A protein has these predicted regions:
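Short, flexible, surface-exposed loop segments at domain boundaries
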Residues: 1-30, 45-85
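A short macromolecule-binding patch
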Residues: 27-39
Length: 85
């Protein structure tokens, strides 16, 4: 399975669909939507598991995700691991 990493700040959270958008700096061309399946690992700053519901706007995160993205605006992909920085 090919993977990639993205680091950014959480810009928007869709709790109903378990997804969030990140942005790097103030550059809207970096906006990416990550879909977070139930089996994805979400880790706090200490490396301990946390719930999707604990993610908050403005958190800086590193996301390990699929190396493909949709051609939509914003691009979308599946997150395998979310780590709060």
């Amino acid at each position: 399975m090919m993977e990639d990493m993205t680091t950014g700040r959480i810009w928007n959270i869709d709790r109903n669909n378990r997804s969030f958008d990140t942005i790097t700096g103030q550059n809207f061309s970096t906006l990416t939507r990550f879909h977070v399946p139930e089996e994805a690992r979400i880790l706090n700053r200490m490396g301990r598991p946390m719930d999707f519901s604990d993610l908050m706007l403005g958190m800086r995160v590193q996301v390990r995700h699929a190396n493909f993205m949709t051609a939509s605006i914003p691009p979308q992909t599946t997150a395998y691991e979310v780590r709060v920085l």
